[in-house]
């Protein structure tokens, strides 16, 4: 295991932030994520915010798993250099999408995939990803949660 991340989202607070006038929260999701959550919301007869909150937890959990992996990879006493800050993290380029069986997956843009490989000292191979990303997302009542594990 390279890194493990977990995040919990308060769904009502997230929904309030998502619906505030002038908010940019929706810009942190790809069009595919927004489309999928709208479809899932219709199918489940519930609020779209529930499904977006779970995906937001997934993005946060991925970031935490990646940071944990970078910290573990650093040499003893070495300064840890993270590729992004919270201000320039490319949230929209980390997608949490369901596959054809409804199983959530983390989909990284090629730029983010390259940064992950570089930051962890993994081979740069655009065709064959040298690591796996496992994700589990859930929501129950007012809470959405996600766990992400990076592994070789």
UniProtKB/Swiss-Prot annotation:
Pfam families given in the database record: ACPS
Enzyme class: transferase
Keyword Metal-binding in annotation: yes
Main location group: cytoplasm
Gene3D superfamilies: 4'-phosphopantetheinyl transferase domain
Cofactor(s) the protein requires to work: Mg(2+)
Catalysed reactions, as listed in the record: apo-[ACP] + CoA = holo-[ACP] + adenosine 3',5'-bisphosphate + H(+)
Places the protein is found: Cytoplasm
The protein's Enzyme Commission number: 2.7.8.7
Binding site for Mg(2+): 7, 60
InterPro entries given in the database record: 4-PPantetheinyl_Trfase_dom (IPR008278), 4-PPantetheinyl_Trfase_dom_sf (IPR037143), ACPS (IPR002582), Ppantetheine-prot_Trfase_dom (IPR004568)
Function: Transfers the 4'-phosphopantetheine moiety from coenzyme A to a Ser of acyl-carrier-protein.
Protein name in UniProt: Holo-[acyl-carrier-protein] synthase
Organism: Bifidobacterium adolescentis (strain ATCC 15703 / DSM 20083 / NCTC 11814 / E194a)
Lineage: Bacteria, Bacillati, Actinomycetota, Actinomycetes, Bifidobacteriales
